[in-house]
Amino acid sequence: MSRVGKMPIALPSGAEATITAEQITVKGPLGSLSQALNGLVQIENASGTLNFKPANDSREANAMSGTLRALVNNMVNGVTKGFEKKLMLVGVGFRAAAQGDKLNLSLGFSHPVVHAMPAGIKVETPTQTEILIKGIDRQSVGQVAAEVRAYRPPEPYKGKGVRYSDEVVVIKETKKK
């Protein structure tokens, strides 16, 4: 059995899980998330803990139990605490400004870059060079952060560009004559 799939998920106070044949829905103080189920994994809700078991002894069912457990754990954490990614702009004249559900970026191009946020994602700019992306869906938060970073990834010689706050950019040495 999968090592990850063996571990039960304890539902914190304020979070509740509803399991049907097709999907699992987790509701919490920040919102609700749903995940489609397949027949390879059985989920039991026993007094505030969720247990995951493969439906049969196949390798696929074993792997899916660990995968589904990780996805549901992220859903529980999302609806109770939420997720956030912090991006930094490094470079002269690089600026960011949040306006409602849009993020205006000035990244050294001849035109401003406007990134529209999907539903359920909030963006803040504490300073002009910091971007904070928040939401309850871990996958969506990471996807939006990756899309914003892709506009101007850090270049290896000076390190200019959009980077994650915990990202380490290895600076290359310039060519010598």
Swiss-Prot record:
Entry GO CC: cytosolic large ribosomal subunit
Taxonomy, superkingdom: Bacteria
Signal sequence range: none
Keywords carried by this UniProt record: Ribonucleoprotein, Ribosomal protein, RNA-binding, rRNA-binding
Family matches, as InterPro entries: Ribosomal_uL6-like, Ribosomal_uL6-like_a/b-dom_sf, Ribosomal_uL6_a/b-dom, Ribosomal_uL6_bac-type, Ribosomal_uL6_CS
Pfam families from the UniProt entry: Ribosomal_L6
Record GO biological process: cytoplasmic translation
GO MF annotation: an example: structural constituent of ribosome
Role this protein plays: This protein binds to the 23S rRNA, and is important in its secondary structure. It is located near the subunit interface in the base of the L7/L12 stalk, and near the tRNA binding site of the peptidyltransferase center.
Family of the protein in this entry: Belongs to the universal ribosomal protein uL6 family.
Subunit structure: Part of the 50S ribosomal subunit.
NCBIfam families in the record: L6_bact (TIGR03654)
Name of the molecule in the record: Large ribosomal subunit protein uL6
Gene source species: Herminiimonas arsenicoxydans
Gene: rplF
